[in-house]
Amino acid sequence: DALLAEKQNFNTTNYFRPGSGNGGPCHPRDGVVLTWLTDKLKMESKLLTNITQVRQDQALALAKHLVSYDLPIIILGKSFKQGVDLTVGSYSILVGEYCTMLGAKIMYDDVLHQPAVVLLAHPNRKLLEKYEPAEDSVIVDLWNLGIPNAKVWGNNAT
């Protein structure tokens, strides 16, 4: 009933867009709080725990994809969402930790003058404009922003 009464259309690109795990950057932080609350209230549902696990599984799959290029990895965007300095709950850091665990060298927002895999972790072309990847670099675009020659990863690959 609540969704039917809502005037905003949830079936739009505002909600259904490519990007990081389970709906966007804020959802993991919300999931931590809601998981704690369900535990405190002794609720039987493990839905939020399962959602968190799926997010981690997706991050590991993305890390394996990035590492498969056998190049240093640069992640553009370290905060948990664009425009803030907070990194707690950051999908970028989670992916970076998995990359490190898999033996890759990772950097955040650093410029290399040699080919690298560049993960565009936030939907902001200006991050990529600020960083000019070396020739033969591989750009992995989570957001399918239409960046020429970029590899798009996930369900929304073209």
Regions found by a protein language model. Give the residues of each.
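Structural/interface elements that position substrates and couple domains in central-metabolism enzymes
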Residues: D1-T158
